[in-house]
C-alpha cells in the first residue's frame, strides 16, 4: 500500500511540466516546487510529466534535475523518477559495478522481487547496459553467494499459497542434515532449497524445523554459514516470512548509531513508497516503538528530509 499523497485534483502533465520549467529558471532552482510536484505524483503521472517536458521544452527532465539538484536530495529524486523495473535495474548496476560492491543491496533487490519482476529486470538490464545481469554477477560476486544469486534469478518458483506437508517435512530434515554436517557439498543443498521453493513453502519449513528440532532455522543458518552467503540466505528466509519486517529492520539499521546510511535509506523509501510502505511503517512502529516518520526526520535535514517525508506520508 502506497503512502505518498496525490492531490484530489491532479494538474495536467503540461501544467506540471510548466511549473518545473519555471522552477529551474534563474539562479539556483525552486526546490520546494520540484518536491511538491514530483513527490506527489505516481509513476504513471511522473512518466507523463517527463514526456510533456521533453516535448514542450526539448529537454530531458532527468538531466535537468541532475544538473539542478545536489547531494542526497538529488540521489533520491533521480531514483524516484523511473518506473520500478528500470529503477531496480539501475540499483543493481550501481551496486555491482560501483567503486564498492554493495552485496546487501543486490540481495535485497533480487530476493524480494517476484519471478515475473526478475524476468523484467533482467530484460531491462540487458537492454540498458548491453550486458546480462548474470554476467555482472559472475564478475562481481563469488562462491556460494554468487551461486545463490544466479540460482534465485534463473529458477522458476511456484508463487501460490499451496504447500505439500510431506515435502515440507522432508526439506526440514534435509536442512537439518545440511547445516549439521558442515560438509562443503551440503552448501548446494541449502542453495537448492532456498532458491527453488516458494515463499509459502519456506515459511512452513521454518515452522516445521522449529517444531522438529527446537531451534530456529535462521539461527542454524547463522551458526553454520558466513559472510554474504549467510546474508543472502537469511534475506530469502526473512522476506518469505515477513518482507515488511525485513524492510523495517533494514531502515532501522540505516539510521542506527552515529551517521546514516543514506544510500540504503533512500533505496528502501523510494522503492517501497508505491508498494507496501504503509505496512512497513506499521511494522516499524510495532517493533521499535517509534514512528518511521520521526526516525527519518531525526536523521535527515533540509529539502532531502522534506522529500523523503513526503514519500512516507502522514506521521502515523
UniProtKB/Swiss-Prot annotation:
Residues that hold Ca(2+) 3 according to the record: 300
The record's note on its domains: A pair of annexin repeats may form one binding site for calcium and phospholipid.
The protein's name: Annexin D5
PTM-bearing positions, type N-acetylalanine: 2
Ligand binding (Ca(2+) 1): 24, 26, 28, 68
Lineage: Eukaryota, Viridiplantae, Streptophyta, Embryophyta, Tracheophyta
Tissue expression profile of the protein: Expressed mainly in roots and flowers. Lower in stems and leaves.
UniProt key word Chaperone: no
Domain of life of the organism encoding this protein: Eukaryota
PANTHER family on file: ANNEXIN (PTHR10502), ANNEXIN D5 (PTHR10502:SF241)
The keyword Phosphoprotein is annotated on this UniProt entry: yes
Species whose genome carries this gene: Arabidopsis thaliana (Mouse-ear cress)
Pfam families in the cross-refs: Annexin
A GO biological process held by the record: pollen germination
Modified residues (Phosphoserine): 95
Amino acid at each position: 500500500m502506497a503512502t505518498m499523497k496525490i492531490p484530489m485534483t491532479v494538474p495536467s502533465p503540461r501544467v506540471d511540466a510548466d511549473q518545473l520549467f519555471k522552477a529551474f529558471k534563474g539562479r539556483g532552482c525552486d526546490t520546494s516546487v520540484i518536491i511538491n510536484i514530483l513527490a506527489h505524483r505516481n509513476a504513471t503521472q511522473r512518466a507523463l510529466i517527463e514526456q510533456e517536458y521533453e516535448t514542450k521544452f526539448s529537454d530531458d527532465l532527468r538531466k535537468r534535475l541532475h544538473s539542478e539538484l545536489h547531494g542526497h536530495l538529488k540521489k533520491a529524486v533521480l531514483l524516484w523518477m523511473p518506473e520500478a523495473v528500470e529503477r531496480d535495474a539501475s540499483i543493481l548496476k550501481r551496486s555491482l559495478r560501483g567503486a564498492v560492491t554493495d552485496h546487501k543491496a543486490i540481495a535485497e533487490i533480487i530476493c524480494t522481487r517476484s519471478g515475473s519482476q526478475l524476468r523484467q529486470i533482467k530484460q531491462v538490464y540487458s537492454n540498458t547496459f548491453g550486458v546480462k545481469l548474470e554476467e555482472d554477477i559472475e564478475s562481481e560476486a563469488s562462491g556460494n553467494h554468487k551461486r545463490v544469486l544466479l540460482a534465485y534469478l534463473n529458477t522458476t518458483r511456484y508463487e501460490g499459497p499451496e504447500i505439500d506437508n510431506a515435502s515440507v517435512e522432508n526439506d526440514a530434515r534435509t536442512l537439518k542434515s545440511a547445516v549439521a554436517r558442515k560438509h562443503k557439498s551440503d552448501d548446494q543443498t541449502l542453495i537448492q532449497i532456498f532458491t527453488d521453493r516458494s515463499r509459502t513453502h519456506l515459511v512452513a519449513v521454518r515452522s516445521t524445523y522449529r517444531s522438529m528440532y527446537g531451534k530456529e532455522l535462521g539461527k542454524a543458518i547463522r551458526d553454520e554459514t558466513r559472510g554474504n552467503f549467510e546474508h543472502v540466505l537469511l534475506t530469502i528466509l526473512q522476506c518469505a516470512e515477513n518482507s515488511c519486517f525485513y524492510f523495517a529492520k533494514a531502515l532501522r539499521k540505516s539510521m542506527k548509531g552515529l551517521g546514516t546510511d543514506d544510500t540504503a535509506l533512500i533505496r528502501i523509501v523510494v522503492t517501497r513508497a508505491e508498494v507496501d510502505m504503509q505496512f512497513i511503517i506499521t511494522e516499524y512502529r510495532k517493533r521499535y516503538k517509534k514512528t518511521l516518520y520521526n526516525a527519518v526526520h531525526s536523521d535527515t535535514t533540509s529539502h532531502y528530509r522534506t522529500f523523503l517525508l513526503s514519500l512516507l506520508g502522514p506521521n502515523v
